[in-house]
Curated annotation (Swiss-Prot):
Regulation: Inhibited by the allylamine antimycotic drugs.
Natural source organism: Saccharomyces cerevisiae (strain ATCC 204508 / S288c) (Baker's yeast)
Site (Important for enzyme activity): 90
Any one GO MF annotation of this record: flavin adenine dinucleotide binding
Residue ranges of coiled coil: none
Subcellular location, principal: membrane
One GO term of the biological process aspect: ergosterol biosynthetic process
pH sensitivity of activity: Optimum pH is 7.5.
Protein name: Squalene epoxidase ERG1
Protein location: Microsome membrane; Endoplasmic reticulum membrane; Lipid droplet
Reaction(s) catalysed by this chain's protein: squalene + reduced [NADPH--hemoprotein reductase] + O2 = (S)-2,3-epoxysqualene + oxidized [NADPH--hemoprotein reductase] + H2O + H(+)
Amino acid sequence: MSAVNVAPELINADNTITYDAIVIGAGVIGPCVATGLARKGKKVLIVERDWAMPDRIVGELMQPGGVRALRSLGMIQSINNIEAYPVTGYTVFFNGEQVDIPYPYKADIPKVEKLKDLVKDGNDKVLEDSTIHIKDYEDDERERGVAFVHGRFLNNLRNITAQEPNVTRVQGNCIEILKDEKNEVVGAKVDIDGRGKVEFKAHLTFICDGIFSRFRKELHPDHVPTVGSSFVGMSLFNAKNPAPMHGHVILGSDHMPILVYQISPEETRILCAYNSPKVPADIKSWMIKDVQPFIPKSLRPSFDEAVSQGKFRAMPNSYLPARQNDVTGMCVIGDALNMRHPLTGGGMTVGLHDVVLLIKKIGDLDFSDREKVLDELLDYHFERKSYDSVINVLSVALYSLFAADSDNLKALQKGCFKYFQRGGDCVNKPVEFLSGVLPKPLQLTRVFFAVAFYTIYLNMEERGFLGLPMALLEGIMILITAIRVFTPFLFGELIG
């Protein structure tokens, strides 16, 4: 976009002052950081390469934990007037069977925390619009998530940020993180179209440049994600979803996981897992051969139409444990800091929770006291572990089970589904983890291994008395597999 098409306020930011904070990136997390700090009285500069509405297939389903975080930040109305679609739970399909998993009761979890100076004038309540209804979100006995067209949601977040008098916006490409002679971060250099390379100074610089972060390595050269699989996405139009207002997880012994969720009254997103960082060379043929046979009948017409049009979108599935923010004058946050498998839709929830905790920890500090801020950021790293570890480990563990590529993993996949079918706490506890409202890693460990032992029990029952010796051997292998799938990631998240 040339300078003549950019609003003057996006290129004329003052570079003669020292800002309290510079925020690099205006994805989901950047505007929330900027808005929260501005409402705390901080002078904030937020830099974004392109303020036009993006077209992406990431960040389209927000779990209840993310919705609650938006309430805490006083930014929940960002889901309004974009034809966002309510989400009330999940339906899991496995080899033709299905089980419904509704979101938790509000009475079973703590009330939403309202952050001082951020929540005011009812900005923690949704508004009434064509798809989001006050009575559903405010009065329903259960928590709700929400799905939406990502770009529309992002535009709303950015508009909220733009209304803050303490926020200055810049359209430009951040090309360098500035450091002083002590190697402490003091700002950023931005290439602004029509203005050139401009240096901006700040007491604290936030790196929020997302999945493909250019600057996460400022924390450490080895802070890079691993990519083990990918999703191929399509838009289904006017689809007849088997379980309206539910996310759909379609599993089977002979295929990779398939996710389906509605993002507007007309559009439904389908994401098909592929167990390689590189997508198939002939995506259309792969869709017809390896995915189409397992699509529920009601979805087949819209699925077939989407395949025939061939508008496929691919996204990598990355994993990146968080590192300590131990560089004075800098804070890396969001996907730039920490990523997990997108199977469970927990990315925005983790990022928004991080913003809530961040504002609580440093929002009232004087950012010119850089050592004090650094101390709080080090504490913040450990305080965030309780919730980020649950969502991150759950995402990786469930993907391992749902994309089972060995007999032991397939046994655990079947056992997990049968565990859900028991209902009661066998559904209630897992969905609290999935929703991002139960930040208790030890409880997650207990539930995961309850699934493992239930799988062993089912296998013994299936083998019968004569097959008991074989069942015992298989049980040992199933348990070893469960340990290998779960514990390294939990250890890495909690200890790292």
